[in-house]
Amino acid sequence: VKLGNMQARRDWGFAGDYVRAMHAMLQQEKPVDYVIATGTSHSVYEFVVEVLRSLNLIPAGADVAQVVNEYVEVDPKLFRTGEIHDLRGDAAQARSALNWKPEVDFSGLVRMMVESDAGIAANQSAKPQFAGKA
């Protein structure tokens, strides 16, 4: 897989958690702008490591960086100009006013994404393949 800046850090969150926050916002008497975020950031590199762990591709005792290098090629052409290195939101106001907090952590989110993609891939490979036009 070709990726750009593996050190870029993002506030990765689960859409279902954000939908719960949006619903809570809509229940307020007066509209208020809230930051909805996990409050923690993880690098693209950490994301890749979690994906590889979820797929059991990092053997016990293995050099993690070496395993990552087997699967990922960093392509400088994919780096964003003017990229903000660390994007992390502060959802303190939403946590307080809406009594909201994210339920799915980073590892859980990655695991859900991997399992979802594995299910999609399994469904696609189970479909009959036709030669020619359908």
Name each model feature, range by range.
Residues V1-A134:
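C-terminal substrate-binding subdomain of Rossmann-fold SDR/epimerase-dehydratase oxidoreductases
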